[in-house]
């Protein structure tokens, strides 16, 4: 083993190799040196584990060149989503409609009217680009956009209830993902949490009995990422609004996924729409931009002007503000809601409402193409998709996909081979077989899958 360590070339020796000199013509010296160190460290580790029997200089040089090429790849890059999870948090959640692309590029590479009022020739507000649209679509007095829904809740609580009590049902103290919990957000806001009711049952008198002179807000949190079923009771939004008005206390509802389309029209379960909650009379409503709305990551706050004006003046708003790329993409999405059919134009909603017959046809076409590749077996199968992103937690969507088996690879090997490509193909393992759910495949993904399988089978030969 010691002999193998001694035979490993030094960084300087590798730098003098002709193959590396060629690489240095197109890469910074420090980058190349770092890659050499990383490769040598890997070899030392392999020697420690007894995996290296002899030192092959040519192989080391090849590994260095490969490491340099790997460094050039973007870390954040496109993937093929074959999981069937529409709002896959790890894969970027909502996809933008195609109409967003042109405007996004325009604003990214040109100066813009971000905070400039062209009519008055003076400074404007960055929020005006989407506030008018939100007010028009939702029939609200005012709106504000921050960088995510947790930030929206934080800002609202900090503005309206810092140092005072916020009453919320015990059954609504949710965790919103990444171990962030409503009580923790409330603590950071400076508001004082006052839990009422029980996990499964909360009544109007629970809220009424908890009201004191220190009560600043009545909060309702929509449990969009789970359901409590069975022996349960919760008060309706309208009832909470009535209590708030009777005791002159503002009401707020965190809707989470923030759908603006009645999903019952497409055979899906009822998910409260933003419009319904606004119509119920809630003073402040918060929801996400990148879930069922189908836009960018954002926390959207709508409601009474007097409360939102206070939030706009809060120094936290500056810390939580969104950039021009978020605003232009959100504006495009909101214009689709106003001017056309969002279910046809917004990818999230289009995938969510896709008919099983459409998905079967899509799977059959892909299966036919895959079967032309030697050493690959596949078939069309019925599977279930999920909406993901903490929305529609009880709903499994009937879908279709194809199974993949490649001669010479077991299930785990094939899944990994597809996953580690330049364009990663993320699949599911269903009943021990690699499976691609076609619901979440985009135009052009089929070609990526076919190319990957052709290369993989070439390796097998």
Swiss-Prot record:
Subcellular location: Cytoplasm
Keyword Iron-sulfur: no
Predominant cellular place of this UniProt entry's protein: cytoplasm
Pathway: Aminoacyl-tRNA biosynthesis; selenocysteinyl-tRNA(Sec) biosynthesis; selenocysteinyl-tRNA(Sec) from L-seryl-tRNA(Sec) (bacterial route): step 1/1
PTM-bearing positions, type N6-(pyridoxal phosphate)lysine: 291
InterPro entries in the cross-refs: PyrdxlP-dep_Trfase, PyrdxlP-dep_Trfase_major, SelA-like, SelA_trans, SelA_trans_N_dom
Cofactors demanded by this protein: pyridoxal 5'-phosphate
A cellular component term, taken from the record's GO annotations: cytoplasm
Catalytic activity as recorded in UniProt: L-seryl-tRNA(Sec) + selenophosphate + H(+) = L-selenocysteinyl-tRNA(Sec) + phosphate
BP GO terms, sorted: conversion of seryl-tRNAsec to selenocys-tRNAsec; selenocysteine incorporation
Highest taxon above the source species: Bacteria
UniProt keyword Glycosyltransferase, yes or no: no
Molecular function per GO: L-seryl-tRNA(Sec) selenium transferase activity
EC number: 2.9.1.1
Function: Converts seryl-tRNA(Sec) to selenocysteinyl-tRNA(Sec) required for selenoprotein biosynthesis.
Protein family: Belongs to the SelA family.
Name this protein carries in UniProt: L-seryl-tRNA(Sec) selenium transferase
Source organism: Caldanaerobacter subterraneus subsp. tengcongensis (strain DSM 15242 / JCM 11007 / NBRC 100824 / MB4) (Thermoanaerobacter tengcongensis)
């Amino acid at each position: 083993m010691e002999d193998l360590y001694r035979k490993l070339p030094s960084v300087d020796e590798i730098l003098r190799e002709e193959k590396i000199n060629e690489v240095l013509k197109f890469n910074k010296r420090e980058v190349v040196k770092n890659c050499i160190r990383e490769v040598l460290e890997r070899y030392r580790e392999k020697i420690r584990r007894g995996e290296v029997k002899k030192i092959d200089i040519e192989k080391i040089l090849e590994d260095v060149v490969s490491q340099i090429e790997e460094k050039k790849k973007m870390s954040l890059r496109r993937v093929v989503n074959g999981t069937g999870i529409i709002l896959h948090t790890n894969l970027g959640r909502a996809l933008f409609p195609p109409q967003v692309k042109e405007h996004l590029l325009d604003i990214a590479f040109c100066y813009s009217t971000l905070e400039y009022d062209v009519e008055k020739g003076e400074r404007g507000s960055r929020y005006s680009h989407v506030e008018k649209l939100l007010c028009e679509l939702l029939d609200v007095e005012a709106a504000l956009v921050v960088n995510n829904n947790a930030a929206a809740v934080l800002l609202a609580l900090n503005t309206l209830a810092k140092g005072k009590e916020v009453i919320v049902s015990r059954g609504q103290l949710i965790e919103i993902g990444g171990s962030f919990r409503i009580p923790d957000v409330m603590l950071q806001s400076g508001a004082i949490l006052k839990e009422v009711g029980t996990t499964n049952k909360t009544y109007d008198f629970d809220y009424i009995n908890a009201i004191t002179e220190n009560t600043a807000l009545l909060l309702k949190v929509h449990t969009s990422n789970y359901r409590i079923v069975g022996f349960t009771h919760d008060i309706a939004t309208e009832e909470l609004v009535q209590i708030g008005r009777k005791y002159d206390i503002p009401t707020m509802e965190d809707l989470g996924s923030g759908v603006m389309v009645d999903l019952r029209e497409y055979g899906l379960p009822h998910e409260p729409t933003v419009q319904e909650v606004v119509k119920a009379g809630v003073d402040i409503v918060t929801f996400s931009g990148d879930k069922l709305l189908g836009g960018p990551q954002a926390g959207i706050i709508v409601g009474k002007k007097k409360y939102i004006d206070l939030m706009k003046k809060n120094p936290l708003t500056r810390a939580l503000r969104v950039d021009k790329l978020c605003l232009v993409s959100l504006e495009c999405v909101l214009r689709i809601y106003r001017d056309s059919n969002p279910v046809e134009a917004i990818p999230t909603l289009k995938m969510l409402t896709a008919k099983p017959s459409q998905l079967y046809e899509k799977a059959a076409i892909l299966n036919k193409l895959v079967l032309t590749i030697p050493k690959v077996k596949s078939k069309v199968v019925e599977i279930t998709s999920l909406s993901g992103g903490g929305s529609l937690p009880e709903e499994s969507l009937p879908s279709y996909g194809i199974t993949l088996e490649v001669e010479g690879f077991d299930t785990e090997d094939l899944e990994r081979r597809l996953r580690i490509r330049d364009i990663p193909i993320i699949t599911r393992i269903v009943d021990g077989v690699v499976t691609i759910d076609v619901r979440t495949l985009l135009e052009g993904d089929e070609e990526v899958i076919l190319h990957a399988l052709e290369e993989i089978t070439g390796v097998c030969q």
